Amino acid sequence: MGHKKPTETTRSYLENAPLPNHGKTYTVVTHKEVIDNTLTLLKKSGFTVQREIYRANTNATIAQGIYHIYPSRSVDEDIINETELGMMFAWTNSYNKLVRFQCAIGAYVKVCYNGMVAGDMMNFKRKHTGTANLDCSINIADQVKNAEKYYKRIIKDRDAMKTINLTEREQAELVGRMFVQEELIDSQQTSIIKAELAKPSFHYGTDAESCWTFYNHVTHALKKAHPRYWLQDSQNFHDFIVAECLNTSKPTIKTETILSEKVVVISEPVEKVIEVDEDITDTQLIENVFLDQ
């Protein structure tokens, strides 16, 4: 936030951007290496790349690649029959030390190209030191290997959002919290969300008070985010909505106490529940311990 807004660019522009010279301890992970490794691994893993989107700041010191992909070899009926969401792979890379390499499998809404990234999917961020080149390639492969599992989790979250209604006031309160408390959106994005609430640019198949509609108003605004922030902002927003609207593991118990003919509503959260992701792989555990996260 506070940076010059990015522009879409070409693959050739990123591949030919000047390389940095930050000393012997800095390992350059070139945009070209990331692009080549991504496209090669996607093809070998049975994914068809339907669209490539590249964005960058001035001089391409921070770059981003977004790929709309289709799992050509999938035999999963839920994935084969999904028509609203497409699968997405995205990465962010830099030459100026402002952001570590990061990548994630996610989804995009076909009607508007809004992106979706869930928090536990973006499990790798690598400094440009030592064996960064190899480590980045390994992580791209790990994300691609688990693509269908991650994609189905997003589909499940989408379905849950469609069952939840948010009043106009509740939506306004969420926007205010995202701007003031969470710092997930900036003033321009807040204005975009306000405009979308009044007059949506797209129809998302749900009514104005649907959590799914609200989610898309925000992800539409997040498309204005700088490449340095877009993946992280998308992840944080998804986590925010899951915690505030979808997470039923922490229900609120409301009790009424009558005092002097007045009703006092006391809200007390129940005891916290710690959830363990049993699908964590050995690769992810090793990355968390040894790759300076």
Spans of model-derived segments:
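N-terminal low-complexity, intrinsically disordered segments
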Residues: 1-62
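Charged, often glycine-rich, active-site loop that binds/positions anionic groups
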Residues: 58-74
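Intrinsically disordered, low-complexity regions enriched in serine/threonine
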Residues: 71-293
